[in-house]
């Protein structure tokens, strides 16, 4: 499985609600229209933490982490080819100007490995030996 993670910030002056609404009703719809056939999953994960959570971790400055999942990296090249189209590319750029601070967008390419959830047996052995 191959993943692309987009770290996204809203445009200055844009509320969280407007950012989310525009992304869900316009930008993600464009993504589905033009390259939805190439991806297995298109997730938008909105930041709900606005201040430091427990454990000392600082809240992220990003408003959304978008994740595309696909079987292999070659499909990313096809998406980039579509986005470079002289008709399609400007459609996305114009739409982004309504809600996204593109200068702050970050891209993370991931070659994903999943160990699964586990069965918890090791934790229970640890608890039993602590008694």
State each model region's role.
Residues 1-131:
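Macromolecular interaction modules
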